[in-house]
A protein has these predicted regions:
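Membrane-water interface regions at transmembrane-helix termini and the short interhelical loops
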Residues: 15-19, 74-95, 156-157, 269-281, ...
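Membrane helical hairpin/interfacial module
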Residues: 2-63
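Extracellular/periplasmic helix-exit of transmembrane alpha-helices
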Residues: 177-207
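Transmembrane alpha-helical segments of multi-pass small-molecule transport proteins
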Residues: 31-35, 59-82, 97-111, 140-152, ...
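Inter-helical loop and helix-membrane interface segments of multi-pass membrane transporters/permeases
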Residues: 45-69, 113-135, 328-348
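Hydrophobic, membrane-embedded alpha-helices of multi-pass small-molecule transporters
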Residues: 37-41, 107-114, 123-189, 220-235, ...
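Membrane-helix boundary/coupling elements in multi-pass transport proteins
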Residues: 44-49, 221-250
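Conserved small/polar residues in nucleotide/adenosyl-binding loops
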Residues: 353-360
Length: 360
């Protein structure tokens, strides 16, 4: 929750993703963000549809035809994203308020009328597990690819200079408070049933459904499923907008935004048709490849004005890239580089693959 918002704040303070990337190499921005945009088209955006339909729509309508609703999902996303200037405004005025109100009602109900008593923790290394679990969500990656669209939306409202910085930090703080309330409420509700369920006895999705059903009955389930769909849809719209905007700039206008904003939903519809499990199994390792790089750049960005030269940026990012390249085959189950990886300090105890193996 905190890292994506921190990344947006840092990128805004530095000016843009490109400005912070230029400390590494003038071409690094195009290469890295271009690769993340491809990952976004092949993984992140299709996954929003798969999650929204499988966990949202099919949660209340198990027989819902998957492919039909994938197509409908991306048609709706296209209709919101087709106008670059108003895409985020429409999301902020229509979809996000509905989703936020529903989630607030659910967590307030769960906090006011708890369904049990919080028990002892049943997961070892909860913080590290949760932190590295962010790899598979790719939230910081989304911050890097959507930051430009977010900043452009603020500047279109005539915020410049110091006014822009204040507006963007204010927006991030409001988002942080809202997310803290929602996630804090869900964490408390989860703790209240910790004596009834163990991590091995139920999946995360079914656990969430069980908690919400116990708290508010079937009506609460409808609310949860609707909020899941809306959360996924808002994410898809912002990412489609970001991808189309980036490649219009990267191709120097040879591919227009209007053309790209139609191509992206078509590509993502095809990928999403394979289903959530296939998407995750084939592409999750790429999140663990890019996530450390963007995380290092976020940390460096915090101290940008204190770092005397670009050498620190180059050294930190290049060594992180080397580590990510070495770790990628391991994420796919190939162990031929394990002897090298095992000599990297802290690789074993805190690696994403290591912790994931202990969860299964």
């Amino acid at each position: 929750m905190g890292l994506p918002i921190l990344a947006i704040i840092v990128l805004g303070m530095c000016g843009s993703v490109q400005k912070i990337s230029d400390h590494v190499n003038k071409k690094f921005y195009t290469v890295m963000i271009g690769a993340i945009m491809i990952l976004c088209c092949c993984v992140s955006i299709p996954r929003t549809a798969a999650v929204g339909i499988e966990m949202g729509l099919q949660g209340i309508w198990p027989g819902a035809p998957y492919l039909v609703f994938v197509i409908l999902y991306f048609v709706i996303a296209f209709l919101f994203a087709k106008d670059r200037g108003t895409a985020l405004d429409k999301v902020g005025k229509i979809l996000t308020p509905i989703m936020t109100i529903i989630l607030f009602i659910l967590v307030v109900k769960g906090a006011v009328s708890p369904i049990g008593t919080p028990g002892a923790a049943s997961v070892d290394n909860a913080f590290v597990n949760s932190f590295l679990g962010g790899y598979s969500t790719g939230d910081v990656l989304v911050s890097f690819l959507a930051a430009g669209v977010f900043f452009d939306s603020i500047k279109r409202k005539a915020y410049e200079g110091e006014a822009f910085r204040k507006a963007h930090v204010r927006a991030c703080l409001i988002a942080a408070v809202c997310l803290a309330i929602v996630y804090g409420g869900l964490l408390y509700m989860g703790a209240c049933v910790s004596t009834e369920y163990t991590p091995d006895s139920i999946s995360n999705a079914n656990l969430l459904l069980a908690i919400i059903r116990s708290s508010g009955g079937q009506i609460a389930i409808y609310g949860l499923c609707l909020s899941v769909v809306l959360a996924c849809l808002t994410t898809a719209i912002s990412q489609i907008t970001a991808v189309a905007d980036f490649y219009e700039t990267a191709t120097h206008g040879k591919l227009s935004y209007k053309v790209l904003v139609m191509i992206v939903p078509i590509v993502t519809t095809i990928v999403a048709s394979f289903g959530l499990d296939t998407i995750v199994s084939l592409t999750s390792p790429w999140f663990s490849f890019f996530y450390p790089i963007t995380l290092v750049m976020t940390i460096l960005g915090i101290f940008e004005k204190k770092i005397p030269n670009d050498g620190a940026f180059k050294g930190a990012v290049y060594f992180t890239v080397i580590y990510a390249v070495l770790d990628l085959p391991h994420e796919y189950g190939f162990g031929f580089l394990d002897p090298v990886l095992n000599h990297i300090p802290l690789y074993g105890p805190v690696s994403y693959t290591h912790l994931r193996a202990h969860e299964t």
